Structures are given as C-alpha cells and as structure tokens.
C-alpha cells in the first residue's frame, strides 16, 4: 500500500471531515486531515494529513467533502470559492467511484478465488498403467497391418497362380477339344472302314456264291459234255481221241479258286492291317485323352482348392479390416473426447486470461484515477496553504 501525507500549519477557519476524517476550526480545536483509501487487485492507496490547531470560524465537509465551506472577512471569494466547491464535488464523486470499484474488485476477487477453488487443477492422474495397453494395442494394430499386407500379397500370388492355372486349363481344354475332334474324325474313319469291311465281306460272300454258282454250272457243263462225249464215243468208235475238256475245266477251276483265294487273302490282310493301325491310333488317342482328362481333373481340383483358400483369405481380410476400422473408431472417439476436454480447458484458460486482462485494464484505469486524485489533492493542498498564509497575514496585521 502506498501512502501520501502532508502537514498543515495553524489557521483561523475550520473545515469538516473529508472521507473518514474530520476538520474543525475554532479556539483550541484540532484539525485532522482527510483520509482517502482506494484499491484495485489487492493494492491500496491512502492519502492522509497531520492535524493543526486553529481558531475563529467553523465549517464542515461531511460525507467525503460533501459539506459547505464557510469563511469570514471575505477570505474565500469569487472564483476561489467556486473552485473549492467544484473540487469538493469532483473529489466526492471520485471517492464514490473508488468505493464502488473497491466493492466490485472485492466481489471479483471472491469470484476468482471461488472459481480457482472449484475449477483448479485437481490431483494429477497417473495414466502410466494405460501406456502398456496402448502399446499393446499399437503392436496389435501394427501386427494386423503387417498380416493384412502379407495376406494381400498371398491373395495377389494366389490370383496370379489362379490366372496361370486358368491359362493352362484353357490350353488343355483347347488341346482336349482338338483331341476329341481327332477322335471323332478317327471314329468316322473307323465307321467308314467298318462299312468298307462290311462291303468287302458282302463282296466275298457274293464271290463265294458266284464261285459256288460257277462250280455248279461247271459241273453241269461237265456232265453235259460227258454225256455228249459219251454219245460221240459210242457213235464214233474208230475216231481219234478228242480234247480232254475235264482237264481244261479243272485247270480253269483251279485258276479261279487260286485267284479267289488270293483276292480273299489280300482283302483280309488289308482289312487286318488297316484295322490294327486304326486300333493303335485309337488306343494312343484314348490314352492321351485319359491323361488329358486326369490332368484336367487335377487342375479343376487345384482350382477349387485355390478358390476355397481365396475365399477364406478374403473372409480373413474382411474380418481384419472390420477389426481395424473398429479399433480406429474407438481410438478416434477417445481422441475426440480428449480433444474436447483440451478445448474446454483452453476456453476456460482464455476466459481466465480475459478476466486477468480486464482486471489489469481496470487496475490501470484506477491508477489513472489515483494520479488525477493526487494531482487534485496537490491543487487542494496548495489552495489550503494559500488560505493559511492569508489568514496568518490577516492575524498579524490585526495584532499590529
């Protein structure tokens, strides 16, 4: 607290109390200087003066320079009286303002103290036991991310393998269709050969029937010729021996039989060789077809296994993505809650700073008021000292 004081010498007039003090002028009456108190933000200002003895007239300033100044012998006249009255009024209003500001300042200090007691930082919480859980969750998230990347890589590899197997399957399927087309062509050739064989068998049967018919005709002709030859022999006994027709027919018969047998053997040999060749080709293509079918079956089984594995990997990936999204959402909600708490604390801190700034401005304003009051008090003091000198001069002149 800063205090200002000044002393007054003896005078012959009297003034009433200023603020909480009182001034009386008269024979043997003491004058106590006014007391001014003001404060802002826990600081105070006081102005006090010493007492002096006076006599003669009496007057009063009550309620903080709120009284009326009285003088005798025309000591205070004209502008000086008005100036003193104006200073009285202004000082009274300033004191009222100071009291009101002190009351408001006290209320603000009480409110700030209550707010700090209610909103002050509580005991610091120990979050160290959450760090292990957070680190474990981070490790799990990192592991899940790595596992997800590995699964994605495996899925890509499986997709590439599936594409490769699909290409092989399409190639084998095209080869199978080509082999089936060749088999169908060979079957048509086999059908044609079967028809040719049947035709040849029918031709052989026809040749056999024709041979039998020729044999029968030959025998009939031989019988007829024998009958004719026998009749001629009986008629012409003395004639020379004729041509042996039986031998000629027998030779012709043997030649036809040899030719027929040769044709039959040639046809059977050609048919047999052709049939064996076709059977070998059919067996080779059948074996190749069986191999292709078994390979296609294996490829289809492998493709189904890869598709099942792909579906399982996709399901695992979806589950991991859901887990990751849930974890991110949970941590996002916690982070948003913490951010909201931080924002609320920052807002409260901003309010406190604004209140502090406002109180600082109020304090500066009160200091300005205090400076002006000090200047006016100095002016008031100079006026009082001038009046004391005037009273002293008048007293001295009366004594003389």
From Swiss-Prot:
Annotated site (Stutter): 267, 327
Annotated spans, Rod-like helical tail: 388-400
GO CC terms in record: apicolateral plasma membrane; cell periphery; costamere; cytoskeleton; cytosol; dystrophin-associated glycoprotein complex; extracellular exosome; intermediate filament
Keywords on record: Coiled coil, Host-virus interaction, Intermediate filament, Keratin, Methylation, Phosphoprotein
Residue list for modification Phosphotyrosine: 391
Tissues expressing the protein: Expressed in a defined zone of basal keratinocytes in the deep outer root sheath of hair follicles. Also observed in sweat gland and mammary gland ductal and secretory cells, bile ducts, gastrointestinal tract, bladder urothelium, oral epithelia, esophagus, ectocervical epithelium (at protein level). Expressed in epidermal basal cells, in nipple epidermis and a defined region of the hair follicle. Also seen in a subset of vascular wall cells in both the veins and artery of human umbilical cord, and in umbilical cord vascular smooth muscle.
Region feature Head, mapped onto this chain: 1-79
Chain positions covered by the region annotation Coil 1B: 134-225
Residues bearing PTM Omega-N-methylarginine: 7, 24, 32, 43, 51
Keyword Nucleus recorded: no
Family: Belongs to the intermediate filament family.
Role description: Involved in the organization of myofibers. Together with KRT8, helps to link the contractile apparatus to dystrophin at the costameres of striated muscle.
Protein name: Keratin, type I cytoskeletal 19
């Amino acid at each position: 607290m800063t205090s200002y004081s000044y002393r007054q010498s003896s005078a012959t007039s009297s003034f009433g109390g200023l603020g909480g003090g009182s001034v009386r002028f008269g024979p043997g009456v003491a004058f106590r200087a006014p007391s001014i108190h003001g404060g802002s933000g826990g600081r105070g200002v006081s102005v006090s003066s010493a007492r002096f003895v006076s006599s003669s007239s009496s007057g009063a300033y009550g309620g903080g320079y709120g009284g009326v100044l009285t003088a005798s012998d025309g000591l205070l006249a004209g502008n000086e009286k008005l100036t003193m009255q104006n200073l009285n009024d202004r000082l009274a209003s300033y004191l009222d303002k100071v009291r009101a500001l002190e009351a408001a300042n006290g209320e603000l200090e009480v409110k700030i103290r209550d707010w700090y007691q209610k909103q002050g930082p509580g005991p610091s919480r120990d979050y160290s036991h959450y760090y292990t859980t957070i680190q474990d969750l981070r490790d799990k998230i990192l592991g899940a991310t790595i596992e997800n990347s590995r699964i994605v890589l495996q899925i890509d590899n499986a997709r590439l393998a599936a594409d490769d197997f699909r290409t092989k399957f399409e190639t084998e399927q095209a080869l199978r269709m080509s082999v089936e087309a060749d088999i169908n062509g060979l079957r048509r050739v086999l059908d044609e050969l079967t028809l040719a064989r049947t035709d040849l068998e029918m031709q052989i049967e026809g040749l056999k029937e024709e041979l039998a018919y020729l044999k029968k005709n030959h025998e009939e002709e031989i019988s007829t010729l024998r009958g004719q030859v026998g009749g001629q022999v009986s008629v012409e006994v003395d004639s020379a021996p004729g041509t042996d027709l039986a031998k000629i027919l027998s030779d012709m018969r043997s030649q036809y039989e040899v030719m027929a047998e040769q044709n039959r053997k040639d046809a059977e040999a050609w048919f047999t060789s052709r049939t064996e060749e076709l059977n070998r080709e059919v067996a080779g293509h059948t074996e190749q077809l069986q191999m292709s079918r078994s390979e296609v079956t294996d490829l289809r089984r492998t493709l189904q296994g890869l598709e099942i594995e792909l579906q399982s990997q996709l399901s695992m990936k979806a589950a991991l993505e859901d887990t990751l999204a849930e974890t991110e959402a949970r941590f996002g909600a916690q982070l948003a809650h913490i951010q909201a708490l931080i924002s609320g604390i920052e807002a409260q801190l901003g309010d406190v700073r604004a209140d502090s700034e406002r109180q600082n401005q109020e304090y500066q304003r009160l200091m300005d008021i205090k400076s002006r009051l000090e200047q006016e008090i100095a002016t008031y003091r100079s006026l009082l000292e001038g009046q004391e000198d005037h009273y002293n001069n008048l007293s001295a002149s009366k004594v003389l």
